[in-house]
Amino acid sequence: MRQMIEATELTKNYGNVTAVNGISFSVMEGELFGLLGPNGSGKTTMIRMLTGQVRPTAGSARVMGLDPAEDPIGVRQLIGIVPEQETPPSFLTAEEYLHFVARIRNLDRIDERCDRWFDLLGFQEKRDALCKDLSRGTRQKLMVAQAFLHEPRLVLIDEPLINLDPIVQRTVKDFLQEYVRDGGTVLISTHILEIAEEICDRVGVLHDGKLLYCGQTEGLAGPGRSLERSFLDLVRGDAGA
């Protein structure tokens, strides 16, 4: 299997604060990998380094063979990105926004691509609504659609299900799992243990900028112990170290 993401001793300091501290991990093709940790653990900073939005203080990364610190535009042309709680332009309709993204990426068959995603994510009836009038869940569907519009092989999603109702959560989770089954690769960040347990093949547990565990999701739980108990023990043990 091809290595889609490789992080090597990635570190990011903001003044005297270390947001990410020497983290190394890899994500393989056809994998749904989760960065799992509480708020403030370094998940978003890690994604921003991998997508070239933030330069690391130390260490390096390769994303689909490119260095995001040296070629951020090249990386972002290849991958899909769903930032946390990103809001599309309020003055555009949902359809206009997808057309705008498609034109920026010089895509063909724009109408066909947009129709597919409105149907696939189940918000065809909202295509003519202004983005400012969309519910939070529909806006999230729209941001997922724009990330997949150019049919990328790798997508990075920061907190994909935050503040979404259960029906929208189910739609997004089902779609991500189907995308991976079809050969795509996804890296998500989440602070919700149940999401990682349900849909992720492997997880990296982050706390205070450090990687405490990286491996199979079921391997996080010890014999006779729940995943939640093991996760909390990891985080509390690190906090007390």
What are these regions (language model features)?
Residues 51:
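Helix-to-loop junction immediately C-terminal to a conserved catalytic motif
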Residues 99, 103-126:
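Conserved ABC ATPase "signature" region
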Residues 130-137:
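Conserved ABC ATPase signature
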Residues 151:
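Conserved catalytic motifs of ABC-family nucleotide-binding domains
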Residues 155-159:
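Catalytic Walker B motif of ABC-type/P-loop ATPase nucleotide-binding domains
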Residues 214-215:
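ABC ATPase "signature
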